[in-house]
């Protein structure tokens, strides 16, 4: 008892601080948020793929229920890992890109493969080969920028090396290009942008120049070399070419050969060792590292996979610098890519709003039902389920005889309501304005009469057409008969002559 009384007295004393004392404390104390040298306990600078620097994202809410479904991209089972990955392949010279991709498909025993943009048979270098689920990102990779290192052969000698460097600088920006004579596409004029180019080395004796180019997807380096020769006035052609970067990945980012892929699959088949296969194939999330990120709650993931709108209440975190119509990636809390999307809100709008559509889905990447279905669990949906169980609604959730009038008036079924066309709505408005039912009936009769008249006219026209065709056929018939008679007479004469000749020979 004594302890409880002493505690109560302490509480009273703590509460009984006069306003004067509070004023003294506020005057004497230094109140400011001081800078701290302590590093945050959570350092995500070394986290993998899309979770890198996760702690630097803006927090909208930290409250969500984690679900045990899904997994970190690097810790997927080997079957899922292979079927949702890509290979940064060093394409060999001579086989075409399609041949190489077909060989990889056969080696890995998968159903679907795709690549990040064709390379000519003689060209080597980076070719991103996407496997199964990663083929959904092929289009975005094909339109990504590329970098090449090429060798140009000039037909005549130059005065100095600077001429070639100057000509390369001239050929930057938007250029007109027509595909080479031997090309798999229609040879029509097109505009392609060259972002940057520089001369690496020039050999005046052999008249060979090595250059580096960063350009838009679909640029013909062979055509660029021809233009370079024309600009210098000596003529030129491409001798050799290698792609050193395709989109996000370059030749220093774990480039593998065809032999590496074959050995990795052999190692897995015979020794059940999947480490080599995991070093050759990378998760598809690595292709999306350059995109801005939005993190969704686990309960919203499957709805997005089924095509639901990306709404603000489902957002956990979002990145700085998101602009409207910018391509972004929507991810889970485990770092898996759900879909690529086009942003409909900026970062500032996301931070100030509490409702609305954040982004429009561009391409869903994740398979459906990887996470459980969590829609239809709201108050209205739960009430509807209860009413179906009690028999107040039919099995499809539609009203029946025993449905209460409050439900019929208040509930809006969005699956059945359709947007009415402007013409129908305007006609109805006119009828409402005119008011009388008699006028509406008269209008209906008039329309029915006009429809009947139009039908009769159509029938008449059809009859007239038939008669004309019959007359034309009758006129042509006798002429055809005459020609047939003359042809038959000629045939008979020929037969007679043939018989006579046979008789003479006998």
Curated annotation (Swiss-Prot):
Name of the protein described by the UniProt record: H/ACA ribonucleoprotein complex subunit DKC1
Residue span, PUA domain: 291-366
Catalytic reactions on record: uridine in 5S rRNA = pseudouridine in 5S rRNA
PROSITE patterns, A to Z: PUA
Gene transcribed to yield this protein: dkc1
Basic residues bias: start-end ranges: 457-466
Sequence similarity: Belongs to the pseudouridine synthase TruB family.
Keyword Protein biosynthesis: no
EC number: 5.4.99.-
Organism of provenance: Danio rerio (Zebrafish)
NCBIfam families referenced in this protein's UniProt entry, alphabetically: CBF5, PRK04270.1, unchar_dom_2
């Amino acid at each position: 008892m004594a302890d409880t009384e002493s505690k109560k007295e302490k509480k009273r004393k703590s509460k009984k601080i006069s306003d004067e004392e509070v004023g003294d404390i506020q005057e004497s104390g230094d109140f400011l948020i001081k800078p701290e040298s302590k590093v945050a306990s959570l350092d995500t600078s070394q986290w993998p793929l899309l979770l890198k620097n996760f702690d630097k994202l803006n927090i909208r809410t930290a409250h969500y229920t984690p679900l045990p479904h899904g997994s970190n991209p690097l810790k997927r089972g080997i079957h899922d890992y292979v079927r949702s990955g890509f290979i940064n392949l060093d394409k060999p010279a001579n086989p075409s890109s399609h041949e190489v991709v077909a060989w990889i498909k056969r080696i890995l025993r998968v159903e679907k493969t795709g690549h990040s943009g064709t390379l000519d048979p003689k060209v080597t270098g980076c070719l991103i080969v996407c496997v199964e689920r990663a083929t959904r990102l092929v289009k975005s990779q094909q339109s990504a920028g590329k970098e090449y290192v090429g060798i140009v052969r000039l037909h005549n000698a130059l005065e100095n090396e600077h001429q070639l460097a100057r000509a390369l600088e001239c050929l930057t920006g938007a250029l007109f290009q027509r595909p080479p004579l031997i090309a798999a596409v229609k040879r029509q004029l097109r505009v392609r942008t060259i972002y940057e180019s520089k001369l690496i080395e020039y050999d005046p004796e052999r008249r060979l120049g090595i250059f580096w180019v960063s350009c838009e997807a679909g640029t013909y380096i062979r055509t660029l070399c021809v233009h370079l020769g024309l600009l210098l006035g000596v003529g030129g052609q491409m001798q050799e070419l290698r792609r050193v970067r395709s989109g996000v990945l370059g030749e220093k980012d774990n480039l593998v050969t065809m032999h590496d892929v074959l050995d990795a699959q052999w190692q897995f088949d015979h020794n059940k060792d999947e480490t080599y296969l995991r070093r050759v194939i990378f998760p598809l999330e690595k292709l999306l590292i350059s995109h801005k990120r939005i993190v969704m709650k686990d309960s919203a993931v499957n709805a997005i996979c089924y095509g639901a709108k990306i709404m603000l209440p489902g957002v956990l975190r979002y990145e700085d610098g998101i602009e409207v119509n910018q391509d972004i990636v929507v991810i889970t809390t485990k770092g898996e890519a759900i879909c690529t999307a086009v942003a409909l809100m900026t970062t500032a709008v996301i931070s100030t709003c509490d409702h609305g559509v954040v982004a429009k889905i561009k391409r869903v990447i994740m398979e459906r039902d990887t996470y459980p279905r969590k829609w239809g669990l709201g108050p209205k949906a739960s009430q509807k389920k209860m009413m179906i169980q009690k028999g107040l609604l039919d099995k499809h959730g539609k009203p029946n005889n025993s449905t209460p009038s409050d439900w019929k008036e208040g509930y809006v079924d969005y699956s059945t309501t359709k947007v009415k066309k402007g013409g129908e709505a305007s006609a109805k408005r006119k009828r409402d304005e005119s008011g009388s039912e008699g006028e509406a009936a008269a209008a209906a009769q008039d329309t029915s009469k006009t429809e009947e008249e139009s039908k009769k006219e159509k029938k008449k026209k059809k009859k007239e057409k038939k008669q004309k065709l019959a007359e034309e056929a009758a006129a042509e018939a006798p002429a055809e008969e005459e020609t047939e008679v003359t042809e038959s007479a000629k045939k008979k004469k020929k037969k007679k002559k043939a018989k006579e000749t046979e008789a003479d020979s006998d």
